[in-house]
């Protein structure tokens, strides 16, 4: 864990999000999808930020226009602590990776759609490796633009009102996709997780540990487990999102 003043080098937009680029050469190499930093943005508690794009010297975060980080401007120094937490783990034997996200939670999974030394790159270079994304939103207007994904990512759209893609719920399409996958990573409203877990038990009984991994993000004030404020209920008791997670085996969640 490192504390440093990261320089904002660029601010722009990416679909419905504000994109903020932070130069953090000692933190960026340790980041991965699902790991995070805590940023001092002027409030009493630090703000939780997940990387959406990771390079050797810098990383991007994508936040809603109402997030405190959306007010940052190039040239501002932001005090960061990180990298923190345990991220998504993609087994080296994976040939078929499934990503499941609502647009609101999508930025956490975006590093898995791009090459990154030491993680996704080794998989993306495998012959026959493929990525499928099940992306949901209330309406077409709320979706992250498909054109912003790498061409190799096969995107399936679900909207509640049917204005784009499948009309209904991601639960409608999840069974067939999880049958196909070697590994699945989910970032969505945790209220959907019990139903997703039940589908996994039905169609992929006997799958190995962490076959399906899910993001759980309660308030994380300290990032190091000291405050005990981010407890997550699991099958064998509780774990802390900031140190044991925020990525957990979907089937271990209660």
PLM features: residue spans?
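Local cysteine-cluster metal-coordination motifs and their immediate loop/turn environment
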Residues: 216-246
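Glycine-rich beta-alpha junction loops
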Residues: 26, 43, 139, 190-191, ...
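Phosphate-binding loop/pocket of nucleotide- and phosphate-handling active sites
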Residues: 244-248, 252-254
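Ferredoxin-reductase
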Residues: 2-74, 138
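FNR/FR-type flavoprotein reductase catalytic core
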Residues: 70-214, 219
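A generic structural signal for residues embedded in beta-strands
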Residues: 39, 79-81, 232
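Short, Lys/Arg- and Gly-enriched loop/turn segments at beta-strand edges
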Residues: 44-53, 85-96, 242
